[in-house]
């Protein structure tokens, strides 16, 4: 069973493989994951206004181009006192896409005067699985158009779609701590802490956790685990 993951980040494949191993055991070896990046596929333009819409857009885009089942996710940070911003703009909150330091600096400045008890936030992830039920014969020859992955599903006669959510609630701290992870991890302290952290009084930001500790509680991990029943159905039925 081949499944394309709509990402250019090979690290996501590792995380999904780990979760597949949890779910399927030795059967995970029957599932071959390949990234959109390794196939030379472009990223679609993310025109959705929700995480769910963008995850589905990306999965549809890849499924359309390959004729294969596709997994995609979209995630970001929601700060309650900011009216759920930065939300889908999380990666480019300061203007430049992926400038983590600038995004953190701007966010901290915007809530500088907010009391600690009111700095609640959560990471949210939407994960989507799109399974083509029937595809055009020449699907591999379609020209990649990053702008229309959401609009019409050209190349898919029909498809089964599943979208799920995962969240990691927490608090925005006042200064960055830790060097692991990426994005807003250095200023986000999850409510759920590793064993022993609360007892010791040394609460950790996401960036102070090991990858294993973070993946066990992360929004993406929760969303991907919620997607596993749909993937199991795909593996067992082949459709």
UniProtKB/Swiss-Prot annotation:
GO cellular component: cytosol
PANTHER family: INOSINE TRIPHOSPHATE PYROPHOSPHATASE, INOSINE TRIPHOSPHATE PYROPHOSPHATASE/HAM1 PROTEIN
Keywords assigned by UniProt, alphabetized: Hydrolase, Magnesium, Metal-binding, Nucleotide metabolism, Nucleotide-binding
Molecular function terms, GO-annotated: dITP diphosphatase activity; ITP diphosphatase activity; metal ion binding; nucleotide binding; ribonucleoside triphosphate phosphatase activity; XTP diphosphatase activity
One Pfam match: Ham1p_like
Coiled coil (residue ranges): none
Binding site for Mg(2+): 74
Designated name of the protein: dITP/XTP pyrophosphatase
Residues at the active site: 74
Job description of the protein: Pyrophosphatase that catalyzes the hydrolysis of nucleoside triphosphates to their monophosphate derivatives, with a high preference for the non-canonical purine nucleotides XTP (xanthosine triphosphate), dITP (deoxyinosine triphosphate) and ITP. Seems to function as a house-cleaning enzyme that removes non-canonical purine nucleotides from the nucleotide pool, thus preventing their incorporation into DNA/RNA and avoiding chromosomal lesions.
Example GO biological process: purine nucleoside triphosphate catabolic process
EC identifiers of the protein: 3.6.1.66
InterPro entries named in the record: dITP/XTP_pyrophosphatase, ITPase-like_fam, RdgB/HAM1
Signal sequence bounds: none
UniProt cofactor(s): Mg(2+)
Top-level enzyme category: hydrolase
Listed Gene3D superfamilies: 3.90.950.10
Positions bound to substrate: 7-12, 75, 182-185, 214, 219-220
Subunit structure and binding partners: Homodimer.
Catalytic activity reported: XTP + H2O = XMP + diphosphate + H(+); dITP + H2O = dIMP + diphosphate + H(+); ITP + H2O = IMP + diphosphate + H(+)
Entry similarity comment: Belongs to the HAM1 NTPase family.
Cofactor mode of binding and number, as noted: Binds 1 Mg(2+) ion per subunit.
